Protein backbone atom coordinates (compact mmCIF):
# COMPACT_ATOMS: atom_id res chain seq x y z
CA UNK A 1 0.00 0.00 0.00
CA UNK A 2 2.74 2.48 0.96
CA UNK A 3 4.59 1.74 -2.29
CA UNK A 4 1.46 2.56 -4.29
CA UNK A 5 0.98 5.79 -2.34
CA UNK A 6 4.57 6.83 -2.95
CA UNK A 7 4.34 6.01 -6.65
CA UNK A 8 1.18 8.09 -6.99
CA UNK A 9 2.76 10.87 -4.96
CA UNK A 10 5.91 10.85 -7.04
CA UNK A 11 3.91 11.17 -10.26
CA UNK A 12 1.99 14.10 -8.82
CA UNK A 13 5.21 15.68 -7.62
CA UNK A 14 6.89 15.36 -11.01
CA UNK A 15 3.88 16.89 -12.75
CA UNK A 16 3.67 19.70 -10.21
CA UNK A 17 7.35 20.58 -10.30
CA UNK A 18 7.60 20.44 -14.09
CA UNK A 19 4.72 22.90 -14.44
CA UNK A 20 5.81 25.33 -11.72
CA UNK A 21 6.69 28.71 -13.25
CA UNK A 22 6.84 30.85 -10.12
CA UNK A 23 10.41 30.74 -8.82
CA UNK A 24 9.40 31.71 -5.29
CA UNK A 25 6.62 29.12 -5.29
CA UNK A 26 9.10 26.50 -6.42
CA UNK A 27 11.73 27.35 -3.82
CA UNK A 28 9.23 27.59 -0.95
CA UNK A 29 7.49 24.39 -1.94
CA UNK A 30 10.80 22.59 -2.29
CA UNK A 31 11.94 23.74 1.14
CA UNK A 32 8.67 22.81 2.80
CA UNK A 33 8.59 19.51 0.95
CA UNK A 34 12.09 18.70 2.14
CA UNK A 35 11.16 19.61 5.69
CA UNK A 36 8.02 17.52 5.46
CA UNK A 37 10.11 14.58 4.34
CA UNK A 38 12.38 14.96 7.33
CA UNK A 39 9.40 15.44 9.62
CA UNK A 40 7.90 12.21 8.31
CA UNK A 41 10.96 10.39 9.59
CA UNK A 42 10.56 12.04 12.98
CA UNK A 43 13.79 14.05 12.90
CA UNK A 44 12.64 17.69 13.24
CA UNK A 45 9.33 19.58 13.69
CA UNK A 46 7.37 20.31 10.53
CA UNK A 47 8.86 23.36 8.85
CA UNK A 48 5.63 24.42 7.17
CA UNK A 49 3.91 25.39 10.43
CA UNK A 50 6.91 27.45 11.57
CA UNK A 51 7.09 29.13 8.20
CA UNK A 52 3.41 30.04 8.38
CA UNK A 53 3.59 31.49 11.89
CA UNK A 54 6.54 33.71 10.97
CA UNK A 55 4.76 35.22 7.96
CA UNK A 56 1.82 37.57 7.44
CA UNK A 57 -1.65 36.10 7.10
CA UNK A 58 -1.65 36.27 3.31
CA UNK A 59 1.80 34.81 3.02
CA UNK A 60 0.91 32.24 5.67
CA UNK A 61 -2.02 31.03 3.62
CA UNK A 62 0.16 30.79 0.59
CA UNK A 63 2.84 28.93 2.49
CA UNK A 64 0.35 26.37 3.74
CA UNK A 65 -0.93 25.84 0.19
CA UNK A 66 2.64 25.59 -1.03
CA UNK A 67 3.47 23.08 1.68
CA UNK A 68 0.37 21.04 0.93
CA UNK A 69 1.18 20.88 -2.76
CA UNK A 70 4.77 20.00 -1.93
CA UNK A 71 3.84 16.96 0.16
CA UNK A 72 3.90 14.67 -2.90
CA UNK A 73 7.47 15.88 -3.44
CA UNK A 74 8.25 14.97 0.15
CA UNK A 75 6.88 11.49 -0.37
CA UNK A 76 8.88 11.19 -3.56
CA UNK A 77 12.06 12.23 -1.74
CA UNK A 78 11.74 9.67 1.06
CA UNK A 79 10.37 6.70 -0.84
CA UNK A 80 13.74 5.25 -1.88
CA UNK A 81 15.40 5.96 1.47
CA UNK A 82 12.83 4.77 3.98
CA UNK A 83 9.64 3.33 2.54
CA UNK A 84 11.12 0.91 0.04
CA UNK A 85 14.00 0.12 2.37
CA UNK A 86 11.50 -0.94 5.02
CA UNK A 87 9.58 -3.18 2.62
CA UNK A 88 12.39 -4.89 0.71
CA UNK A 89 13.48 -7.72 2.99
CA UNK A 90 15.14 -11.12 2.98
CA UNK A 91 14.01 -14.44 4.37
CA UNK A 92 15.52 -17.88 4.84
CA UNK A 93 13.85 -20.81 3.09
CA UNK A 94 15.04 -24.43 3.28
CA UNK A 95 13.83 -27.43 1.32
CA UNK A 96 14.14 -30.30 3.77
CA UNK A 97 15.56 -33.76 2.92
CA UNK A 98 12.12 -35.17 2.04
CA UNK A 99 11.48 -32.35 -0.43
CA UNK A 100 14.90 -32.90 -2.03
CA UNK A 101 14.50 -36.69 -2.26
CA UNK A 102 11.03 -36.33 -3.78
CA UNK A 103 12.34 -34.10 -6.56
CA UNK A 104 10.37 -31.00 -5.53
CA UNK A 105 13.21 -28.47 -5.73
CA UNK A 106 12.21 -26.85 -9.02
CA UNK A 107 8.51 -26.90 -8.09
CA UNK A 108 9.15 -25.02 -4.84
CA UNK A 109 11.60 -22.53 -6.35
CA UNK A 110 9.23 -21.78 -9.22
CA UNK A 111 6.46 -20.78 -6.80
CA UNK A 112 8.66 -18.12 -5.22
CA UNK A 113 9.91 -16.95 -8.62
CA UNK A 114 6.43 -16.66 -10.11
CA UNK A 115 5.39 -14.48 -7.19
CA UNK A 116 8.23 -12.11 -8.10
CA UNK A 117 10.68 -12.83 -5.29
CA UNK A 118 14.40 -12.80 -6.04
CA UNK A 119 16.82 -15.60 -5.16
CA UNK A 120 20.00 -14.06 -3.70
CA UNK A 121 21.60 -17.14 -2.12
CA UNK A 122 21.37 -20.91 -2.58
CA UNK A 123 23.44 -23.97 -1.70
CA UNK A 124 23.15 -27.70 -1.03
CA UNK A 125 24.25 -28.81 2.42
CA UNK A 126 23.96 -31.90 4.60
CA UNK A 127 23.76 -30.33 8.07
CA UNK A 128 25.27 -32.08 11.06
CA UNK A 129 23.17 -32.98 14.10
CA UNK A 130 24.83 -30.15 16.04
CA UNK A 131 24.02 -27.70 13.26
CA UNK A 132 20.40 -28.84 13.19
CA UNK A 133 20.20 -28.29 16.94
CA UNK A 134 21.40 -24.72 16.46
CA UNK A 135 18.76 -24.17 13.80
CA UNK A 136 15.96 -25.51 16.01
CA UNK A 137 17.35 -24.08 19.26
CA UNK A 138 14.01 -22.48 20.16
CA UNK A 139 12.38 -25.94 20.21
CA UNK A 140 14.94 -27.68 22.41
CA UNK A 141 12.45 -28.16 25.25
CA UNK A 142 9.87 -29.84 23.03
CA UNK A 143 9.56 -33.64 23.10
CA UNK A 144 10.04 -33.93 19.33
CA UNK A 145 13.28 -31.89 19.29
CA UNK A 146 15.72 -34.79 18.79
CA UNK A 147 13.62 -36.39 16.09
CA UNK A 148 13.35 -33.06 14.28
CA UNK A 149 17.13 -32.59 14.36
CA UNK A 150 17.75 -36.18 13.26
CA UNK A 151 15.50 -35.68 10.26
CA UNK A 152 17.01 -32.34 9.18
CA UNK A 153 20.50 -33.89 9.31
CA UNK A 154 19.44 -37.08 7.49
CA UNK A 155 20.18 -35.86 3.98
CA UNK A 156 20.80 -32.91 1.66
CA UNK A 157 19.00 -29.63 2.32
CA UNK A 158 18.54 -26.81 -0.19
CA UNK A 159 19.26 -23.63 1.78
CA UNK A 160 18.06 -20.40 0.16
CA UNK A 161 17.72 -16.69 0.79
CA UNK A 162 14.90 -14.90 -1.00
CA UNK A 163 14.44 -11.15 -1.31
CA UNK A 164 11.34 -9.09 -2.01
CA UNK A 165 8.60 -6.81 -0.79
CA UNK A 166 6.91 -8.62 2.12
CA UNK A 167 8.76 -11.87 1.41
CA UNK A 168 8.83 -12.98 5.08
CA UNK A 169 5.11 -12.72 5.68
CA UNK A 170 4.01 -13.89 2.25
CA UNK A 171 6.64 -16.64 2.21
CA UNK A 172 4.93 -18.16 5.24
CA UNK A 173 1.56 -17.96 3.49
CA UNK A 174 3.04 -19.57 0.41
CA UNK A 175 4.46 -22.42 2.51
CA UNK A 176 1.25 -23.08 4.45
CA UNK A 177 0.53 -24.33 7.96
CA UNK A 178 3.03 -26.55 9.81
CA UNK A 179 0.54 -29.42 9.59
CA UNK A 180 -0.08 -30.13 5.90
CA UNK A 181 -3.55 -31.43 6.79
CA UNK A 182 -4.42 -27.91 7.93
CA UNK A 183 -2.76 -26.16 5.00
CA UNK A 184 -4.93 -24.55 2.35
CA UNK A 185 -4.92 -25.93 -1.20
CA UNK A 186 -2.57 -23.82 -3.28
CA UNK A 187 0.10 -23.66 -0.57
CA UNK A 188 3.28 -25.73 -0.88
CA UNK A 189 2.47 -27.97 2.08
CA UNK A 190 -1.22 -28.09 1.22
CA UNK A 191 -0.45 -29.36 -2.27
CA UNK A 192 2.69 -31.42 -1.76
CA UNK A 193 2.94 -32.72 1.83
CA UNK A 194 0.89 -35.09 3.98
CA UNK A 195 2.24 -35.28 7.55
CA UNK A 196 3.83 -32.86 10.02
CA UNK A 197 7.01 -34.91 10.28
CA UNK A 198 7.55 -34.69 6.52
CA UNK A 199 6.35 -31.21 5.62
CA UNK A 200 9.16 -30.64 3.05
CA UNK A 201 10.01 -26.97 3.69
CA UNK A 202 11.01 -24.43 6.34
CA UNK A 203 10.59 -20.65 6.26
CA UNK A 204 11.54 -17.88 8.69
CA UNK A 205 8.57 -16.70 10.75
CA UNK A 206 9.66 -13.09 11.35
CA UNK A 207 12.34 -10.45 10.68
CA UNK A 208 14.55 -11.38 13.65
CA UNK A 209 14.29 -15.09 12.94
CA UNK A 210 15.14 -14.46 9.28
CA UNK A 211 18.21 -12.46 10.26
CA UNK A 212 19.42 -15.17 12.66
CA UNK A 213 18.78 -18.05 10.27
CA UNK A 214 20.43 -16.34 7.32
CA UNK A 215 23.54 -15.63 9.40
CA UNK A 216 23.59 -19.26 10.60
CA UNK A 217 23.32 -20.85 7.17
CA UNK A 218 25.17 -18.30 5.02
CA UNK A 219 28.32 -16.22 5.12
CA UNK A 220 27.86 -12.60 3.95
CA UNK A 221 29.93 -13.23 0.81
CA UNK A 222 27.61 -16.05 -0.20
CA UNK A 223 24.72 -13.63 -0.73
CA UNK A 224 24.46 -11.59 -3.91
CA UNK A 225 22.88 -8.17 -4.33
CA UNK A 226 21.70 -7.42 -7.86
CA UNK A 227 18.87 -5.86 -9.84
CA UNK A 228 16.76 -8.27 -11.86
CA UNK A 229 15.15 -7.27 -15.14
CA UNK A 230 11.69 -7.94 -13.69
CA UNK A 231 11.96 -5.45 -10.82
CA UNK A 232 10.78 -2.43 -12.81
CA UNK A 233 7.66 -4.40 -13.74
CA UNK A 234 7.08 -5.46 -10.14
CA UNK A 235 7.92 -2.27 -8.23
CA UNK A 236 8.46 0.44 -10.85
CA UNK A 237 6.23 3.48 -11.43
CA UNK A 238 6.12 3.04 -15.22
Swiss-Prot record:
<keyword id="KW-0496">Mitochondrion</keyword>
<dbReference type="GO" id="GO:0005829">
    <property type="term" value="C:cytosol"/>
</dbReference>
<keyword id="KW-0460">Magnesium</keyword>
<dbReference type="GO" id="GO:0006183">
    <property type="term" value="P:GTP biosynthetic process"/>
</dbReference>
<comment type="similarity">
    <text>Belongs to the NDK family.</text>
</comment>
<comment type="function">
    <text>Major role in the synthesis of nucleoside triphosphates other than ATP. The ATP gamma phosphate is transferred to the NDP beta phosphate via a ping-pong mechanism, using a phosphorylated active-site intermediate. Shows the highest specificity towards GDP.</text>
</comment>
<feature type="active site" description="Pros-phosphohistidine intermediate">
    <location>
        <position position="202"/>
    </location>
</feature>
<keyword id="KW-0793">Thylakoid</keyword>
<dbReference type="GO" id="GO:0006228">
    <property type="term" value="P:UTP biosynthetic process"/>
</dbReference>
<feature type="binding site">
    <location>
        <position position="178"/>
    </location>
    <ligand>
        <name>ATP</name>
    </ligand>
</feature>
<dbReference type="Pfam" id="PF00334">
    <property type="entry name" value="NDK"/>
</dbReference>
<keyword id="KW-0418">Kinase</keyword>
<dbReference type="GO" id="GO:0005743">
    <property type="term" value="C:mitochondrial inner membrane"/>
</dbReference>
<dbReference type="InterPro" id="IPR034907">
    <property type="entry name" value="NDK-like_dom"/>
</dbReference>
<keyword id="KW-0150">Chloroplast</keyword>
<comment type="subunit">
    <text>Homohexamer.</text>
</comment>
<feature type="binding site">
    <location>
        <position position="189"/>
    </location>
    <ligand>
        <name>ATP</name>
    </ligand>
</feature>
<feature type="binding site">
    <location>
        <position position="144"/>
    </location>
    <ligand>
        <name>ATP</name>
    </ligand>
</feature>
<dbReference type="GO" id="GO:0006241">
    <property type="term" value="P:CTP biosynthetic process"/>
</dbReference>
<dbReference type="GO" id="GO:0004550">
    <property type="term" value="F:nucleoside diphosphate kinase activity"/>
</dbReference>
<feature type="binding site">
    <location>
        <position position="96"/>
    </location>
    <ligand>
        <name>ATP</name>
    </ligand>
</feature>
<dbReference type="GO" id="GO:0008270">
    <property type="term" value="F:zinc ion binding"/>
</dbReference>
<dbReference type="InterPro" id="IPR036850">
    <property type="entry name" value="NDK-like_dom_sf"/>
</dbReference>
<feature type="transit peptide" description="Chloroplast and mitochondrion">
    <location>
        <begin position="1"/>
        <end position="85"/>
    </location>
</feature>
<feature type="binding site">
    <location>
        <position position="199"/>
    </location>
    <ligand>
        <name>ATP</name>
    </ligand>
</feature>
<dbReference type="GO" id="GO:0005524">
    <property type="term" value="F:ATP binding"/>
</dbReference>
<keyword id="KW-0067">ATP-binding</keyword>
<keyword id="KW-0479">Metal-binding</keyword>
<keyword id="KW-0934">Plastid</keyword>
<dbReference type="GO" id="GO:0005758">
    <property type="term" value="C:mitochondrial intermembrane space"/>
</dbReference>
<feature type="binding site">
    <location>
        <position position="172"/>
    </location>
    <ligand>
        <name>ATP</name>
    </ligand>
</feature>
<dbReference type="GO" id="GO:0050897">
    <property type="term" value="F:cobalt ion binding"/>
</dbReference>
<dbReference type="InterPro" id="IPR001564">
    <property type="entry name" value="Nucleoside_diP_kinase"/>
</dbReference>
<dbReference type="InterPro" id="IPR023005">
    <property type="entry name" value="Nucleoside_diP_kinase_AS"/>
</dbReference>
<protein>
    <recommendedName>
        <fullName>Nucleoside diphosphate kinase III, chloroplastic/mitochondrial</fullName>
        <ecNumber>2.7.4.6</ecNumber>
    </recommendedName>
</protein>
<dbReference type="GO" id="GO:0009543">
    <property type="term" value="C:chloroplast thylakoid lumen"/>
</dbReference>
<keyword id="KW-0547">Nucleotide-binding</keyword>
<keyword id="KW-0808">Transferase</keyword>
<keyword id="KW-0546">Nucleotide metabolism</keyword>
<dbReference type="GO" id="GO:0005739">
    <property type="term" value="C:mitochondrion"/>
</dbReference>
<keyword id="KW-0809">Transit peptide</keyword>
Amino acid sequence: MSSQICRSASKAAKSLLSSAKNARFFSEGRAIGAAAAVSASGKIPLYASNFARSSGSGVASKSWITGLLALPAAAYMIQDQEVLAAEMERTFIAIKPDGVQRGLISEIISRFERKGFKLVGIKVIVPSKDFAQKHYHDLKERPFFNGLCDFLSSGPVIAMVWEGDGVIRYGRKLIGATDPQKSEPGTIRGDLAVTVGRNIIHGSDGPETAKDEISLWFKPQELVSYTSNSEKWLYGDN
